[in-house]
């Protein structure tokens, strides 16, 4: 019997509870979890800024987490490339993905005769520092203005 493979993807720059929630959710839906780490160049294009932590370090951090079986760097040319190579049974998307994005992904994969189940983590983890942005804001609040007199 073949292992059921799940894939999820993200920047995973400053780890927070939302990341762990997504990874645990993904692992519950498969025997093997592969995480695609967004490339520094891709993050800069999409978010307008480079990640704090370089891609190779983010990959190492993610692949050492308990639910993760393997981490790979995303493609610089085609976001579907690693998915087409892995050929997962399940793709897990974060709570910030829209129905349009999900349907678009399914359509693009179908063009390559790949029909994985696409699941979405439905709820955000509600706690302090549930996003990388919140962590950065708190670091600035605590350190930059007081310690550096900025």
Swiss-Prot record:
Reactions performed catalytically: FMN + ATP + H(+) = FAD + diphosphate
Gene3D superfamilies cross-referenced by the UniProt entry: HUPs
Recorded family membership: Belongs to the archaeal FAD synthase family.
Organism of this sequence: Methanococcus maripaludis (strain C6 / ATCC BAA-1332)
Cofactor list: a divalent metal cation
Keywords noted in UniProt: ATP-binding, FAD, Flavoprotein, FMN, Nucleotide-binding, Nucleotidyltransferase, Transferase
SUPFAM superfamilies in alphabetical order: Nucleotidylyl transferase
GO molecular function term, any single one: FMN adenylyltransferase activity
Pathway recorded for this protein: Cofactor biosynthesis; FAD biosynthesis; FAD from FMN: step 1/1
GO terms of biological process kind: FAD biosynthetic process; FMN metabolic process
Role, per record: Catalyzes the transfer of the AMP portion of ATP to flavin mononucleotide (FMN) to produce flavin adenine dinucleotide (FAD) coenzyme.
InterPro entries recorded: Archaeal_FAD_synthase (IPR050385), Cyt_trans-like (IPR004821), FAD_synth_RibL (IPR024902), Rossmann-like_a/b/a_fold (IPR014729)
EC number per UniProt: 2.7.7.2
Protein name: FAD synthase
Binding-site positions, ATP: 11-12, 16-19, 96, 124
NCBIfam families tied to this protein: cyt_tran_rel
Summary of subunit composition and partner proteins: Homodimer.
């Amino acid at each position: 019997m073949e292992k059921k493979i799940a894939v999820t993807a993200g920047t995973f720059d400053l780890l927070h509870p939302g990341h762990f929630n997504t990874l645990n959710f993904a692992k519950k839906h498969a025997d093997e979890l592969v995480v695609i780490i967004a490339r520094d160049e891709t993050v800069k294009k999409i978010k307008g800024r480079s990640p704090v932590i370089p891609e190779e370090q983010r990959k190492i951090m993610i692949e050492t987490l308990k639910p993760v079986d393997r981490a790979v760097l995303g493609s610089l040319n085609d976001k579907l490339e690693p998915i087409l190579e892995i050929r997962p049974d399940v793709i897990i998307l974060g709570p910030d993905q829209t129905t349009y994005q999900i349907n678009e992904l399914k359509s693009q994969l179908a063009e390559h005769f790949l029909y994985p189940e696409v699941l979405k983590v439905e709820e955000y983890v509600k706690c302090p520092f549930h996003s990388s942005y919140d962590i950065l804001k708190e670091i600035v609040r605590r350190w930059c203005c007081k310690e550096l007199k900025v």
